[in-house]
Structures are given as C-alpha cells and as structure tokens.
Amino acid sequence: IGVIATAVIATLVPKDRGETAPLAFRDELKVVGRPQVLLGLLMTVLGFGGMFTVYTYIQPLLTEVAGFAESAVSPILLVFGVGMIVGNLLGGKFADRKLMPALLATLATLTLVMGLMTFALHSQWAMVLFVGLLGAAAFATVSPLQLWVLQKAEGAQSLASSLNIGAFNLGNAFGAWLGGAVIMHGAGLGALTWVGALVPLSALLVALYSVSLQKRSDRLLVAAESNAA
C-alpha cells in the first residue's frame, strides 16, 4: 500500500517549481502566531474533537445501546471507512472550488449529523447509516481545515501543516477525554452524540468569527487601496 501511495503521489501531486527562499524559523513562528492561523488550529481541534467524542466509544454504543452483537461491530466500522473515503474526496473537491463555504458547510454538516445521530441510537438500521454519515461528515472537514490553515500561514506552510496535524491529534485526545467525562459523570453513552455535536458547533462559531475577521480585513485593504489611488 505504501509503494502504491508513493507512486500515486509522485504522479499526481504537482511539482513545486517556485524558487522562494524559505523563512527563518523565527519568522515562521511569527507567521503561525497570526490570529487567523491560531483560529484555524482551534477549528481543527474542535472539529475533530467532536467526532472522537463518539467514535472512541463506538463499540459500546453499537453493542450496549443499539443492541448489535459484538461480531457486527467490525462490518459496521467498514461502513465508517467507506464514509471516510467519500468524505475526503468530497471535502477536497469543495475546498478547491470555494474554501470558505466548504469550511462552514462541512462543519455545519458534521454538527447536524452528530446531533441527529442521537435519535438513531436505538434503531440498528439507522445506526449503520449514521456511522457511515459520521465518517463522511468528519473527514469532509479535513481538507478545508488543512487548506484554511495553509492559506493563512503563507510563507510558513511546512510548520503550519505540522502544527495542524498536531491539532488533529489533540482533537482526538480531547474528544476521547470529553466522551469519558460524559460517561463518568453519569450522563451515559446515549449523551455522547449530542454532547459531541456541541464541539463541532463551537468550531463552526470559531469559523464564522474567522470569516468575519477576513471580510473586515478585505474591506480595510480595499479602502486603503482606494485612498492610495
């Protein structure tokens, strides 16, 4: 699989022919410290954290709440995997076309899917469907989140990309912790989906704030150019 992946990357990924000199590490740190970059990293943590609030505990959700046999868990997770592939493809296409709408739409979709999953917990067929939708909705956010951070970190994309991967992993840990806290404090497995939905909802609110900052910055730039003319 690794050899195939390497061949595909070498064939399809465009070669960077730019001659731009890399920034010094100190300057890269200044770039990734920009408010828009930090907001993007926060969106990544919250966006993926919500999904892992549920996914970390997907086995007991399926067996203890939905009533599936243990042997059914692995086939159902294959449905999640198919959803991941579909979500990655769709998220990448949407992000390439219109990044800002793609970012907002994918976070909103993830919030909606997780919220509605609350009402599917006791229906086996509905749960299979929503497990697939969860995979698709969660991984549709990956490309928009990554591209948003890279665009806002112009000149320090390598460092920003590394930090964003770390943000995805931090989201994984945060989601697992949050799900465990929900269960430990007695809310039960059934509360994981709606509590988890609040996390990408908060990511969506951060995204809306980030977009408003971007629009304000664009207006100021246009005004400055008009005054200079």
PLM feature spans:
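A membrane-interface helix-boundary motif in multi-pass transporters
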Residues: 1, 69, 181-201
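C-terminal membrane-cytosol helix-exit motif in multi-pass small-molecule transporters
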Residues: 1-19, 206-211
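Juxtamembrane intracellular "pre-TM" segments in multi-pass secondary transporters
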Residues: 10-43
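Intrinsic disorder in cytosolic terminal tails and internal cytosolic loops
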Residues: 23, 209-229
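Extracytoplasmic gate region of multi-pass secondary transporters
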Residues: 35-78, 82-85, 99
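C-terminal transmembrane helical hairpin of 12-TM major facilitator-type secondary transporters
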Residues: 99-145
